[in-house]
Every structure is written in C-alpha cells, then in structure tokens.
C-alpha cells in the first residue's frame, strides 16, 4: 500500500469514526460521555478532517451542491455541540482544516480515489450540512 493511499485510508477512518458518533445512542447522558471520551485536541482534529474533506469534495471533486467554507465550519461546530463537546477551544479549527486541505492537494493519491472515498465516508456529515444552510 502506498503512503498516499494509507493517508486516504487513515483520513477515511477518522471521518468514519466521527460520522459513527453522529448516530444517537440509546443511553442517557450520551453527550457528556462523548465529551469525556474524546480529548479536545482529537475533537479538533476530527472536525478539521471533516472540514478539509468537505472542501476537497466541493472544490476538487466539483460537488457544487456543497456549501461555502463558512457553512462547512458552522456545521462542524454544530456537530461538536450536539456531541456535548466544548467548542471554546476551536479557534484553531479554520487554520488546521486549511492545512489538512492543502495536504490533501499535495497527496499523490489519484483524485478519483479520494473523491470516491470521501463521498462514501462523509455522507452523515454532508447530510448534516444540508440542514445548516
């Protein structure tokens, strides 16, 4: 497996882990459990990955149905709030997501592979964006 392919797989796993967390659990107090189980730096990293992949889909994969960067960021913060995460530390989210996006542009993985992977793994987040608009 090429290093660039490994990056796409790891990025997809990160997206899937966050997407899986969007499904409500039948346990009371899920938000506080979720907030306690994911360190703040990991929260920001997961959200930045979602934002970067969404921007990649919109720009590189020509997904004109996806919103602008501001709406994507707003959706990411809304997801964090729904999870009970403390969004007060998210000032670095725009810059970190842009850094990840630039890294995706430099990645040697074929664009078609990245587009296909992101389209599959990002569905829950993309659906959440449609409600924010």
Curated annotation (Swiss-Prot):
Disulfide bonds join 61-115. A lipid is attached at residue 21 (N-palmitoyl cysteine). It comes from Dickeya dadantii (strain 3937). Out proteins are required for the translocation of pectate lyases and cellulases across the outer membrane. This is Pilotin OutS. It comes from the Bacteria. To K.pneumoniae PulS. A lipid is attached at residue 21 (S-diacylglycerol cysteine). The lineage of its organism: Bacteria, Pseudomonadati, Pseudomonadota, Gammaproteobacteria, Enterobacterales.
């Amino acid at each position: 497996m090429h290093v660039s392919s490994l990056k796409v797989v790891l990025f997809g796993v990160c997206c899937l882990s966050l997407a899986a967390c969007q499904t409500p659990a039948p346990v009371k107090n899920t938000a506080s459990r979720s907030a306690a189980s994911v360190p703040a730096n990991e929260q920001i990293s997961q959200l930045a990955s979602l934002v970067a992949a969404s921007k990649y889909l919109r720009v590189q994969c020509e997904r004109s149905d996806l919103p602008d960067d501001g709406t994507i960021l707003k959706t990411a913060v809304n997801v964090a709030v729904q999870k009970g995460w403390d969004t007060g530390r998210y000032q670095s989210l725009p810059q970190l997501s842009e850094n990840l996006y630039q890294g995706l542009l430099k990645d040697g993985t074929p664009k078609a592979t990245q587009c296909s992977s992101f389209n599959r793994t990002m569905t829950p987040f993309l659906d959440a964006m449609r409600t924010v608009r």
